Every structure is written in structure tokens, then in C-alpha cells.
């Protein structure tokens, strides 16, 4: 029987690395706990730079889902809003384009450094859980050849 575990890639921003490093450690540990394989950790300078790395990882047949991890801290301008909004939009577009989950483990916008620290565990573990759940459910859906009159629930 072939291995049914989920192969993940994690794209992590180096900006605010005191936060994202801890997010990465939590994400790797949680993926292992849930039985998934982290095949690639790809570091990018900042959250805004994630899209190109995500795209390259989604092209790979040996990657089932991509988890993104970042922290976009509020500054004196609206720069954090632009970064967070555009990053989220683009990675969602890539997920739909490639038919693979890309989950949003990016803290912000509008958060302080202290608020971001408080959210490390929640954002990293939820992003991993969502990636694994969605990859497994998509795998099950794609196995179904024909839908008959009975309702199918994939969970």
C-alpha cells in the first residue's frame, strides 16, 4: 500500500524572524505530530516575497500543500495592510490555480509585536492543520470517479 501521508512545504518569512522562527518550529512539530512530512522549508526575505516560492513549490508533484508563515507588524504607515492583503490574495490565487492547498499562517496586519508573539502557536498550528485536512479531503474527492444519488460527505 502506498504511503498516504501528506507532504508539506513551509514558506517562512525571515522578516520579524524572532517571531517566524518560533512559528516554524511549532509548525514542523505539529506537522510531525499529525503524521505529515515536511519536505521543504523555504525561507523568503518577507511575507510579500512568498508568492514566487509558493508557485514553484506547487508545481512539484511531491508536494501536497504549502503552509505560509509570517508576521506583518503594524508600523506608522499602511504598508502592513498592503503587504498582508496582497500576499493573502496572491497565495489564494495560486492555490486555486494549482488545485493544492496553500494555507495562511501570516499574523497581521494591524498587530503589534506583542500581539504577534501571543499568536505564534495559534497561527502556525492552525495553518498546518488546515493544509493537512484540505489536502486529505481533496485527495479523497479526487478518488471518487462518479457521484451517485447518495450524498457524499468528505471530512
Swiss-Prot record:
SUPFAM superfamilies from the UniProt entry: Lumazine synthase (SSF52121)
EC main group: transferase
EC code: 2.5.1.78
Catalytic residues of the enzyme: 79 (proton donor)
Positions bound to 5-amino-6-(D-ribitylamino)uracil: 15, 47-49, 71-73, 104
GO function terms (MF aspect): 6,7-dimethyl-8-ribityllumazine synthase activity
A matching Pfam family: DMRL_synthase
Binding site residues for (2S)-2-hydroxy-3-oxobutyl phosphate: 76-77, 119
Reaction equations catalysed: (2S)-2-hydroxy-3-oxobutyl phosphate + 5-amino-6-(D-ribitylamino)uracil = 6,7-dimethyl-8-(1-D-ribityl)lumazine + phosphate + 2 H2O + H(+)
UniProt entry keywords in alphabetical sequence: Riboflavin biosynthesis, Transferase
Listed InterPro entries: LS, LS/RS, LS/RS_sf
Gene Ontology process terms (BP): riboflavin biosynthetic process
Record-level GO cellular component terms: riboflavin synthase complex
Pathway field: Cofactor biosynthesis; riboflavin biosynthesis; riboflavin from 2-hydroxy-3-oxobutyl phosphate and 5-amino-6-(D-ribitylamino)uracil: step 1/2
PANTHER family xref list: 6,7-DIMETHYL-8-RIBITYLLUMAZINE SYNTHASE, 6,7-DIMETHYL-8-RIBITYLLUMAZINE SYNTHASE DMRL SYNTHASE LUMAZINE SYNTHASE
Family: Belongs to the DMRL synthase family.
Record function comment: Catalyzes the formation of 6,7-dimethyl-8-ribityllumazine by condensation of 5-amino-6-(D-ribitylamino)uracil with 3,4-dihydroxy-2-butanone 4-phosphate. This is the penultimate step in the biosynthesis of riboflavin.
Full protein name: 6,7-dimethyl-8-ribityllumazine synthase
Lineage: Archaea, Thermoproteota, Thermoprotei, Sulfolobales, Sulfolobaceae
